[in-house]
Amino acid sequence: MPTVNQLIRKPRQANVKRNKVPALQENPQKRGVCTRVYTTTPRKPNSALRKVAKIRLTNGFEVIGYIPGEGHNLQEHSVVMIRGGRVKDLPGVRYHIIRGVLDTQGVKNRKQRRSKYGAKRPK
């Protein structure tokens, strides 16, 4: 425990909170255009081909967004909406593409957790 004199000489430092999604600039979502759609492999110990897209946002940022769900219709020049949320086993992927918004279609034949994948209610 520091003395009063030590605290006068060097005050306590406040914790600086680092922004985990800087490209959103405090907005809940941002729009962007896909510049490249590709698959990448996750870190150890996982193994898969994860679908991701490089996106140029309206504010000029270039980010990598994860495409959730099974199957997608994205290609170069598709207009997408992104939200924050990293993918733990993909380094550098700090954003998710929102399904069912703008050019991104919802997941087909989705019965549960439909709102997360932009799927309409089955008849």
UniProtKB/Swiss-Prot annotation:
Disulfide bonds: none annotated. GO terms for cellular component: small ribosomal subunit. Gene3D superfamilies: Nucleic acid-binding proteins. The modification 3-methylthioaspartic acid is found at residue 89. InterPro entries: NA-bd_OB-fold, Ribosomal_uS12, Ribosomal_uS12_bac. CDD domains: Ribosomal_S12. Keywords: Methylation, Ribonucleoprotein, Ribosomal protein, RNA-binding, rRNA-binding, tRNA-binding. GO terms for biological process: translation. One of its GO terms (molecular function) is rRNA binding. It holds the Pfam family Ribosom_S12_S23. With S4 and S5 plays an important role in translational accuracy. Part of the 30S ribosomal subunit. Contacts proteins S8 and S17. May interact with IF1 in the 30S initiation complex. Belongs to the universal ribosomal protein uS12 family. This is Small ribosomal subunit protein uS12. It comes from Rhizobium etli (strain ATCC 51251 / DSM 11541 / JCM 21823 / NBRC 15573 / CFN 42). The gene is rpsL.
